[in-house]
A protein has these predicted regions:
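N-terminal targeting signals for export/organelle localization
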Residues: 1-38, 172
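Structural motif corresponding to alpha-helix initiation and N-cap regions
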Residues: 20, 46, 99, 120-124, ...
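Short loop/turn microsegments at loop-to-beta-strand junctions
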Residues: 35, 57, 136-137
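Short, ordered coil/turn segments that flank beta-strands lining enzyme active or ligand-binding pockets
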Residues: 42-43, 52, 144
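Short active-site neighborhood of thiol/selenol oxidoreductases, capturing the structured segment around
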Residues: 46-70, 76, 89
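Structural microenvironment flanking redox-active thiols in thiol-disulfide oxidoreductases
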Residues: 70-109, 119-126
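Thiol/disulfide oxidoreductase modules built on the thioredoxin-like
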Residues: 104-112, 119-172
Length: 172
């Protein structure tokens, strides 16, 4: 079961489970294979994570309705730019029932990396129970061997994300 939510503030507690900012780093010999993520991209086109084989991939789970997602969006875009060439960023937009609000979010925050449109959470469920993105926002870092190396539940900072990408790209 994947529990999703938005924020930890009392105003955001209307039945959602928010992230607490916890960071889980998985030792290379303990990592499990990330699922193959496929789907329609916001704005058109399709995505298949198999095309990113051999690359460090950062997945960020977000929703246009999520206040912590709006707060972290500039940090994610900055980290994506700073780590270009070392990691590929992919958004996983969830629980937006149509693309219009999600596309408005992408435009408002000048997000340059692609996002998979996953309104029913089908792609999120592929992560299973080992290290699921069980809050919104959540961020997962996948190593070049296709294994989940790190997870952040809740907002992530630019510094934390750049550090994670650098470590994972270095084989740590």
């Amino acid at each position: 079961m994947v529990l999703t939510g938005c924020g930890a503030a009392p105003a955001a507690q209307g039945g959602f489970v928010g992230g607490d900012g916890s960071l889980t780093i998985v030792a290379p010999d303990q990592r499990t294979t990330a699922p193959q993520i496929t789907g329609e991209l916001l704005g058109g086109g399709t995505f298949d994570s198999a095309t990113l084989s051999g690359q460090v991939v950062v997945y960020n789970v977000w929703g246009s309705w999520c206040a912590p997602c709006r707060k972290e969006a500039p940090a994610l875009e900055a980290a994506a730019r700073r780590t270009a060439g070392r990691a590929t960023f992919v958004g996983l937009n969830t629980r937006d029932l149509d693309q219009a609000p999600a596309q408005a979010f992408v435009r408002a925050f000048d997000i340059t990396y692609p996002s998979v449109f996953d309104p029913d959470g089908r792609e999120l469920l592929k992560f299973g129970t080992d290290l699921p993105p069980s809050a919104i926002p959540s961020t997962l870092v996948v190593d070049a061997q296709g294994r989940i190396a790190a997870r952040v539940l809740g907002e992530v900072t630019e510094a934390t994300l750049v550090g994670l990408v650098d470590d994972v790209a270095a084989g740590k």
